[in-house]
UniProtKB/Swiss-Prot annotation:
The lineage of its organism: Bacteria, Pseudomonadati, Pseudomonadota, Gammaproteobacteria, Moraxellales. Substrate binds at R75, I114, E155. Keywords: Cytoplasm, Lyase, Pyruvate, Ubiquinone biosynthesis. This is Probable chorismate pyruvate-lyase. Pfam families: Chor_lyase. Its EC number is 4.1.3.40. It comes from Psychrobacter cryohalolentis (strain ATCC BAA-1226 / DSM 17306 / VKM B-2378 / K5). The keyword tRNA processing does not apply. SUPFAM superfamilies: Chorismate lyase-like. It catalyses: chorismate = 4-hydroxybenzoate + pyruvate. GO terms for cellular component: cytosol.
Length: 168
């Protein structure tokens, strides 16, 4: 049996977590199936922030543009499944250049999971993904191309999700 700590501290993700880190399509939909109910979204932050150099690079900004300040709409949330502790910590970065036309609704999500909007018409979206270990847990960072707009979404699987997934 894998312990709670190994889910957080191993250099490689637990085998049982790999499908969740690599899934294409809506993570929201799969988490709701696992929870047996809609996800509860707790907003931690919504507002404008300057992008860091690393975030600019992840969004594909290159050359001299890297040295210029860039604002993004940032949304940070906890996603709850079917218990009192959050399963996933998520951060969504929407560069201002991506928030034009109908994409402006991404600033008005409130307690709606972003997956409801992104995967409303398509089961998958063009993306680039990386997986890394953070102090909070295993994280997938996905750069989506949503109708020609770049969106960077980071989803960290928290200890409670690992415990439930691994049946600890």
């Amino acid at each position: 049996m894998i312990s709670h700590l190994s889910c957080i501290t191993n250099s490689l993700p637990p085998t049982e977590l790999l499908p969740w880190l690599n899934i294409e399509g809506s993570l929201t939909a799969l988490l709701e199936v696992k929870a047996g109910r809609p996800l509860l979204v707790e907003r931690r932050f919504e507002g404008y922030r300057l992008l860091s150099l690393a975030q600019k690079k992840q969004l594909g900004i290159k050359g001299a543009a890297l040295s210029h300040p860039r604002l993004a709409w940032v949304r940070e949330v906890y996603l709850y499944g079917n218990d009192e502790l959050p399963w996933v910590q998520a951060q969504s970065l929407f560069p201002l250049s991506s928030l034009k036309g109908s994409a402006r609704r991404l600033q008005q999500l409130k307690s709606t999971p972003i997956g409801y909007v992104l995967f409303n018409r398509s089961r998958t979206l063009p993306n680039q993904r990386s997986i890394k270990h953070t102090a909070d847990g295993w994280q997938r960072q996905t750069l989506y191309d949503w109708h020609g707009r770049s969106l960077l979404i980071s989803e960290t699987f928290l200890p409670r999700f690992c415990e439930k997934q691994l049946d600890i």
